[in-house]
C-alpha cells in the first residue's frame, strides 16, 4: 500500500483564519523550501504534530513557524527554536496508531492556541460531519509533487469507523486511536507534506482540533480516505507532556569506538511548582555516576544526571534511564543510543580529513571497507547481501556538499546517506552530481552506505565520493527552479535531494 502524508481539492486559506497553524521546518532552509510537516500550537510552549514526522529528529534539527499563512514571507524572527521532542512511547508505525508527538519550544509563545476536542464531543459526532483540514503539502493527486507556500484548506466529511475499516489493508487496523475523513468519490483530501497538521471541527461556533494528519492510501482517491490521529483519545498523554517537565526523551551520542562512554541528561522545571525527581535507574549495565537531581527542582532551574556505559564490540547499542516525578507526571524514560564501528583505513581517513580540514573528525568503516577510485573514494567490492559504509563523525555545524555518483541496479542496489542517524537519501541506477546537507547540530555524523541485495548487478555496482566541501554557513541557497526529484536516473542536484529529504522520505 502506498501511504502518503498528505491539500487536494481545496483553496488558499484566508490570512489569519488559523492563527494556531504551524509549520515544521528543517533548520537551514527557508520556510517555503524547508517545510516538511504541519503542526498546531496548543498553548504555552507546546506544539502538536505527528510522530512519523520526527524520525531520529532532535529539537536542534528543526524550527517552527506559527500563524504565518505565507511561509515564504516568514522572517527569521518568526522561526521558533525547539528545545525538546516528545514522541508517543508506543509509536512504531502510523498504521498501528499512536502517531502523535509534541514539540517543546525554547520559549513560551504568545499567540492564540487551538482548543482540543473533548472525548464527549468526538463521540457525539455523526458520520458526514463537516471537518476542515489545512496544510502546505501536495496539491497534485498524481505522483508529481506540487506544494504550496500559502496555506491551503479543504472541507471533508467524517467517515464512520466501520466504513473506513471496510476499505481493507491497513485501514482494517484502525482503532479508537484514529479516524478517517474524506469523500467517497474522492477529489478532496490532505496529502504529502500535510502530515502533523490539524483537522478541525466547529463546536458551537468555535473551531477545535479533532485530529492530526497521519496517513492514507494515495491522495484524494475514490473509495480511500485520509487517516487522522484521534486527539481526544490522547488527552491524558498530551496533558502529561505539557505539565512543564522538560527532559531528553531520546539522546543520540553518535558513532564511537568501543570502551567506556558517558552521557548527560538534563531535566528542567518549567512548571508552576516545585518538582521532585526520584528513583533513578538504568538498564543494560549502564550506571549513574553523577546526579544533581536529588534535591527538589525549583521553578525555572535545571539538574543533570550523568551515566557511564561500557560499550563492547560493534553495532547499535542503547539503554534507558527512568525516574519518577510528582505533580501527576509519573515515570519518565529517556533512551540513550550509540553506534559503534571500527575505525576506517587510515589512508581513507586522511583523504576525508583533507577534504574537511581543521576539524576534529573520526572516520569509521561499516561492513566492507571503502577504497580509492581514480578521483576520490568508492564503496568496496561487494558480494550478494553485503554492504560497504563510511561514517564521518564530529563535523561542525554548517553545510556539507558531496560530489558523488552511483552506478547500480536501479531500485535494488542503493547508496544510502544518513545525517545524524536519519536516512535522508537513497540513490540507485546511474546518477551523478552534487548534493548538499544542512548540519544543524554542534557536532554531526554523516554516513554513506552502499547496500547490495541478493540478486544481480548492473553498472559498476558502487557508490563514489569524489569531493567534499564544507561551509560554516547554515543556510542552503534557495533555488528558483525545481528538478524532478528522481532518485533513479540522470543528474542529482541539491534541490532534488531536498525533495527527497522533505517529502519522499516520509512515506505516509
Task: Kindly label every feature range from the protein language model.
Residues 35-55, 62-63, 68, 147-162, ...:
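C-terminal subregion of chymotrypsin/trypsin-like serine protease catalytic domains
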Residues 212, 221, 243-342, 476-486:
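Feature for long, exposed domains in two main contexts
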Residues 448-459:
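Short beta-strand-plus-loop segments that form exposed binding edges in beta-rich domains
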Amino acid at each position: 500500500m502506498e501511504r502518503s502524508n498528505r491539500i487536494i481539492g481545496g483553496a488558499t486559506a484566508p490570512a489569519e483564519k488559523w492563527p494556531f497553524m504551524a509549520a515544521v521546518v528543517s533548520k537551514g532552509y527557508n520556510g517555503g523550501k524547508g517545510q516538511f510537516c504541519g503542526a498546531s500550537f496548543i498553548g504555552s510552549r507546546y506544539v502538536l504534530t505527528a510522530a512519523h514526522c520526527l524520525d531520529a529528529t532532535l529539537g536542534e534539527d528543526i524550527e517552527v513557524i506559527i500563524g504565518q499563512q505565507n511561509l515564504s514571507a516568514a522572517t527569521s524572527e518568526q522561526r521558533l527554536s525547539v528545545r525538546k521532542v516528545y514522541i508517543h512511547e508506543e509509536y512504531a508505525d502510523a498504521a498501528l496508531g499512536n502517531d502523535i508527538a509534541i514539540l517543546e519550544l525554547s520559549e513560551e509563545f504568545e499567540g492564540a492556541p487551538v482548543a482540543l476536542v473533548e472525548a464527549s464531543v468526538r463521540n457525539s459526532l455523526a458520520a458526514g460531519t463537516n471537518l476542515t483540514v489545512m496544510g502546505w503539502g501536495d496539491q497534485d493527486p498524481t505522483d508529481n509533487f506540487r506544494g504550496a507556500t500559502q496555506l491551503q484548506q479543504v472541507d471533508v466529511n467524517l467517515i464512520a469507523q466501520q466504513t473506513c475499516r471496510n476499505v481493507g489493508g491497513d485501514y482494517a487496523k484502525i482503532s479508537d486511536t484514529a479516524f478517517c475523513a474524506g469523500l467517497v468519490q474522492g477529489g478532496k483530501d490532505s496529502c504529502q507534506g500535510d502530515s502533523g497538521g490539524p483537522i478541525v471541527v466547529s463546536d458551537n461556533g468555535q473551531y477545535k482540533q479533532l485530529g492530526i494528519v497521519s496517513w492514507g492510501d494515495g491522495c484524494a482517491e475514490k473509495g480511500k480516505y485520509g487517516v487522522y490521529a484521534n486527539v481526544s483519545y490522547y488527552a491524558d498523554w498530551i496533558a502529561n507532556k505539557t505539565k512543564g517537565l522538560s527532559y531528553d526523551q531520546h539522546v543520540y551520542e553518535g558513532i564511537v569506538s568501543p570502551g567506556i562512554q558517558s552521557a548527560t541528561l538534563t531535566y528542567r522545571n518549567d512548571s508552576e511548582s516545585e518538582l521532585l525527581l526520584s528513583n533513578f535507574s538504568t538498564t543494560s549495565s549502564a550506571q549513574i555516576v553523577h546526579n544533581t537531581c536529588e534535591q527538589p527542582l525549583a521553578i525555572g532551574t535545571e539538574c543533570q544526571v550523568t551515566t557511564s556505559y561500557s560499550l563492547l564490540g560493534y553495532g547499535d547499542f542503547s539503554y534507558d534511564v527512568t525516574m519518577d516525578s510528582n505533580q501527576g507526571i509519573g515515570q519518565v524514560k529517556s533512551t540513550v543510543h550509540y553506534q559503534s564501528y571500527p575505525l576506517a583505513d587510515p589512508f581513507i581517513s586522511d583523504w576525508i580529513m583533507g577534504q574537511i580540514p581543521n576539524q576534529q573528525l573520526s572516520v569509521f568503516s561499516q561492513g566492507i571497507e571503502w577504497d580509492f577510485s581514480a578521483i576520490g573514494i568508492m564503496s568496496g567490492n561487494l558480494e550478494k547481501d553485503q554492504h560497504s559504509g563510511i561514517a564521518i563523525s564530529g563535523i561542525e555545524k554548517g553545510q556539507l556538499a558531496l560530489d558523488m555518483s552511483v552506478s547500480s541496479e536501479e531500485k535494488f542496489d542503493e547508496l544510502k546517506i544518513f545525517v545524524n542517524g536519519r536516512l535522508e537519501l537513497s540513490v540507485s541506477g546511474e546518477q551523478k552530481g552534487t548534493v548538499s546537507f544542512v548540519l544543524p547540530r554542534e557536532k554531526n555524523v554523516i554516513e554513506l552506505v552502499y547496500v547490495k541485495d541478493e540478486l544481480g548487478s548492473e553498472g559498476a555496482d558502487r557508490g563514489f565520493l569524489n569531493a567534499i566541501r564544507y561551509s560554516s554557513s547554515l543556510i542552503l541557497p534557495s533555488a528558483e527552479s525545481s528538478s524532478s526529484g528522481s532518485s533513479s536516473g540522470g543528474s542529482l542536484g541539491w534541490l532534488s535531494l531536498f525533495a527527497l529529504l522533505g517529502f519522499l522520505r516520509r512515506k505516509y
